[in-house]
Amino acid sequence: MLRTVKLNAGYKELHILFDVDADIKKNSITAVVGPNGSGKSTLLKSIFGLATVHSGQVFLNGGEITSLPPHTRTKLGIAYLPQTDNVFANLTVEENLKIAAYTVDKEEVKDRIDAALDAFPELRAFMKRKAGTLSGGERQMLAMATALVRKANVLMLDEPTAQLSPKFAEIIFDRILKLRDDLKLTILLVEQNVQRALEISDNAYLLVSGRVAFNGTANELLEHEKFEKLCMGIVD
């Protein structure tokens, strides 16, 4: 469904990723793991059009999207949710959801918002509250709900449980699984809790210094005899 081919990317003249080949399967969760500075977030940003692609290609459903701007990729069904600043803090929950529906036909808006709230029912109690007053976990739910309103079918999450309590982090992990299982989304996950990310993922890519050091099933990486060393970037 989503592929990168010999992707070399970074920011202006700075090169972060080198010859990254990735093949993200439809209706799956793929974890992108690796030590700090390995290029995990840059890979997501490259797919969404927020990083500089020096060479290589990005494909969605067989069509090349390498040169398309982010707003066009959004219309094609790709959603990228960064760790912070992923909602409009000064607007209410309801307003955030309505803004997410700006490209939706008027007669569909209510149904889209209702469907998103069905996936994240906790938000119904906060519709008139400013997003900035929500807890970190509630804001993350709102961000994912806005992606559903936009009818995203590829959801890229950049450290969605960062700074959340263990209890709320588990709620977010559970919702990620339900987005795959119930709504058939394709999810690309960068997560600081590597162990938990791999436990809920189908497949995994390990990046070390901007290069793919491992790709396979998440279980294969979890059970690798050098798992801890690999995740620290120690590759023999």
UniProtKB/Swiss-Prot annotation:
Per its UniProt record, what InterPro entries does this chain match?
A: AAA+_ATPase, ABC_transporter-like_ATP-bd, ABC_transporter-like_CS, BCAA_Transport_ATP-bd_LivF, P-loop_NTPase
- Which of this chain's residues are annotated to bind ATP? 34-41
Alphabetically ordered keywords of this record? Amino-acid transport, ATP-binding, Nucleotide-binding, Transport
Record Pfam families? ABC_tran
Domain named ABC transporter: residues = 2-234
Signal peptide feature range: none
* The UniProt record lists the keyword Kinase: no
List the PANTHER family. BRANCHED-CHAIN AMINO ACID TRANSPORT ATP-BINDING PROTEIN LIVF-RELATED, HIGH-AFFINITY BRANCHED-CHAIN AMINO ACID TRANSPORT ATP-BINDING PROTEIN LIVF
Protein name per UniProt: Probable branched-chain amino acid transport ATP-binding protein LivF
Question: Which species is listed as the source?
Answer: Archaeoglobus fulgidus (strain ATCC 49558 / DSM 4304 / JCM 9628 / NBRC 100126 / VC-16)
What is the organism lineage in this UniProt record? Archaea, Methanobacteriati, Methanobacteriota, Archaeoglobi, Archaeoglobales
The coding gene here is: livF
